[in-house]
Every structure is written in structure tokens, then in C-alpha cells.
Amino acid sequence: MENGNGEGKGEFINQNNDFFLDSMSMLSSLPPCWDPSLPPPPPPPQSLFHALAVDAPFPDQFHHPQESGGPTMGSQEGLQPQGTVSTTSAPVVRQKPRVRARRGQATDPHSIAERLRRERIAERMKSLQELVPNTNKTDKASMLDEIIEYVRFLQLQVKVLSMSRLGGAGSVGPRLNGLSAEAGGRLNALTAPCNGLNGNGNATGSSNESLRSTEQRVAKLMEEDMGSAMQYLQGKGLCLMPISLATAISSSTTHSRGSLFNPISSAVAAEDSNVTATAVAAPEASSTMDDVSASKA
């Protein structure tokens, strides 16, 4: 069996060799396909081979888009070869990181302007509060109410003092009544009997004692600080009035209303002033104050 197989294999190899030799002789007998007189074609450029070599892993992006981590097929950057440089893409603008400002140090122009405005308001409020004596309010609403009340009192005081230059008592009375209505009942001494006076218009003993203490207090405050004196008079429901004006008003109201007002005045010595005035009581709605008169000469 082995000899038979060996002989069969040898015959098959010989037949193949004969077929190969016949094929080679047939090909050599064929005429050439090109003209040998023509020059050989130029070799391909080396850049093409270089680009193909660099772009060899490019098809892998289509087979494994998730593993490559590159851009999608629809984007221009994904279709662009990796070995070339893009000349049409816009420059990437990097956003500046936002820095959070520390407390009290704003960086926004609007915030800075608002902070400066609040600081100016606080400074003006402090200066305005210093003009009003004996202020003890801390919140802005209460402080503004107190300042408004004090300014109204000063306006009333100025109007009353300006009446000393008026001529007749007949014209002073209606003006003073108008001031009483404007001040909300602060100057009601001419429209209601004063507490502490008897039926004859004379002051009682307790009224005289309170009169003296009030006069001394007002005179001392006027020597130290005029603003504090005004604040004290405002709290007591009093208002400074020249003696001549009080006398004229008293005479006018005595003849017209039957002696409803009887001013009481006393002189208080002061070295630095020659002003003579009387403090006329203005009873409040809550409690009626005694008729107090004070003068500063």
C-alpha cells in the first residue's frame, strides 16, 4: 500500500510540474502589452503614502465610535483627517470663570453703585439725627417720625415768634387760631381755659410751683443748648411767645371771649441774651398742661 501511494504522489507532482512549464512557455510566447520604447510611468508621490499611513486608524472610528471618543460622523471635525490642520474652523473663545465676590466687596458696577448709595443715605440719616436733641430711636421709621415732629414744632415756633412784629391784636388772634389748627391742637391756649387757674383767672399755689420749676428748667436749657430747650418745650406742650404778643392776644380775647386767657410771665436773667419771651401753654389732647410763661432777658 505504501509503495502504491508513493508512486501515485510522484505521478501527481510530475503532472503539476509539466502543467506549470507549459503555462510559462505559453506566457512567454505572448506579445508584450506595452511599448518598450515608452518611458516608465513616474512613481506616486510620497505624501500620498504618508497620508495613507497616518490615516490608517481612521476607519476604526466608524467601527468603534464609542471607544475612539472622537466627534460624531455628522460633525465636520469627525470627517476631517487627523493628520491635517483645519484652516476654516473658528477660534475657540474660552469663557472667563466667574469669581464669586466676598461679602461686602461686590464686583458688579450696579452692586457697587447701590452699596455707595446706601452708605450715603446712612451718613445723611446720622447727620439728621444729630440735629434733633434727645433722640433715642434706632429704626429709621421711628427716627424719621421724631424728626418730622420736631421740624413741625420749629415751624410753629417760628410763626409764633414772627407775630411779634405784627401791629394789632385783632389780626394776631385769627392767625394764631389758624396755627393752632395747623399744628393739630398744639397751641390751644386761646381756645380753652387753662388748667390750674381759678374762675377769676388767678393762678393757684400748685400752678405757681410748677411754673417756677418749668421756667428754671427752660432757662437752664436755653443757656446750654437751644435745641434741647425747644425739645423740652415740645414735650411739655409749650411754645415761646413774646410778652408783647401774649399781652395783645390776652387783651383781645378778654374783650371778645370773656377772659378765657390770662398769660403769666416772669423774668429770668440771662447774661448772653436780651430777648424777652413768654412760654404759652399748649394743652395736648391726652392731658391739659398748666399755663406756663417764661422769659429770657
Swiss-Prot record:
Q: Does the keyword Transcription apply?
A: yes
A GO cellular component annotated for this chain's UniProt record is: nucleus
Q: Where is this region: Basic motif?
A: 105-118
UniProt GO molecular function: DNA-binding transcription factor activity; protein dimerization activity; transcription cis-regulatory region binding
Under the heading SUPFAM superfamilies, the entry gives: HLH, helix-loop-helix DNA-binding domain (SSF47459)
Compartment(s): Nucleus
| Entry comment describing in which tissues the protein is expressed | Expressed in trichomes of the root maturation zone. Detected constitutively in flowers.
Show the ranges annotated as biased composition (Polar residues).
73-90
InterPro entries to which the protein is assigned, alphabetical: bHLH_dom, HLH_DNA-bd_sf, IND-like
Job description of the protein: Transcription factor that regulates the development of root hairs. Does not seem to be involved in the regulation of sperm cell development.
Record text on subunit structure and interactions:
Homodimer.
Instruction: Quote the protein name from its UniProt record.
Output: Transcription factor LRL3
Source organism of the structure: Arabidopsis thaliana
State the gene name recorded for this protein. Answer: LRL3
